[in-house]
Regions:
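Short, charged, surface-exposed interaction patches
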Residues: 1-193
Length: 193
């Protein structure tokens, strides 16, 4: 008899990546730079206050568009230059990141509107401890497959021998659901004869 055994386990992500983005507009490049730098400093200071270190924080090169040079100048453009700044957190402090997300509204009082709705500004959560749980999951999948095989043997009034062949399926790690992307479901299916 050839059977498949399933093992699933829920784990919490141990790495979080969060691109924090804001936009700034101006008609003067030096003034745009000063306001971008001031807001970046405020965000970094806020992140430090929450408990993140410089090793967790990366400031990317800003993306600056000259709307006049791109032919958008139809006389209705109020600001010539538009900049998008991204400050990224890459951290193992997943719980701290989740708590900080709820406090980001505090930056509004400093005149900073954080863009969190765009696809590129959503936090990403990773689980990198697969090797720690792999042996137990393979064991659970094997036991599950054996239970299925025993049921086959019992229902057909047969006896079950030792494993002739076994293959471990591919491990998959996916979010448990869309509301808690930091909880991961690890899954493996083993095939046994």
């Amino acid at each position: 008899v050839t059977v498949k055994g399933l093992a699933e386990k829920e784990v919490k992500a141990n790495i979080a990546i969060w691109p924090i983005q804001f936009n700034q507009v101006d008609n003067d490049l030096p003034s745009l730079y000063k306001s971008m730098q001031a807001k970046t400093d405020i965000i970094v200071k806020f992140l430090h206050k929450q408990g993140f270190t410089d090793s967790d924080i990366t400031i990317s090169q800003p993306s600056i568009d000259d709307r006049q040079a791109q032919g958008y100048d139809s006389g209705n453009i109020k600001f010539r230059y538009s900049a998008q700044v991204t400050i990224s957190l890459y951290t193992s402090k997943v719980d701290l990141l989740l708590a900080t997300q709820n406090k980001m509204v505090q930056l509004v009082k400093d005149g900073i509107a954080i863009s969190n709705q765009s696809y590129g500004a959503r936090p990403e959560f990773l689980y990198t401890g697969l090797n720690d749980i792999k042996p137990q999951m393979v064991q659970a999948a094997t036991q599950n497959a054996r239970e299925v095989a025993l049921k086959f043997a019992k229902d057909s009034d047969s006896s079950l021998g030792k494993i002739k062949t076994a293959s471990q399926g591919q491990f998959s790690i996916s979010p448990r659901d869309s509301n808690t992307p930091y909880i991961k479901k690890v899954r493996v299916v083993s095939t046994l004869t």
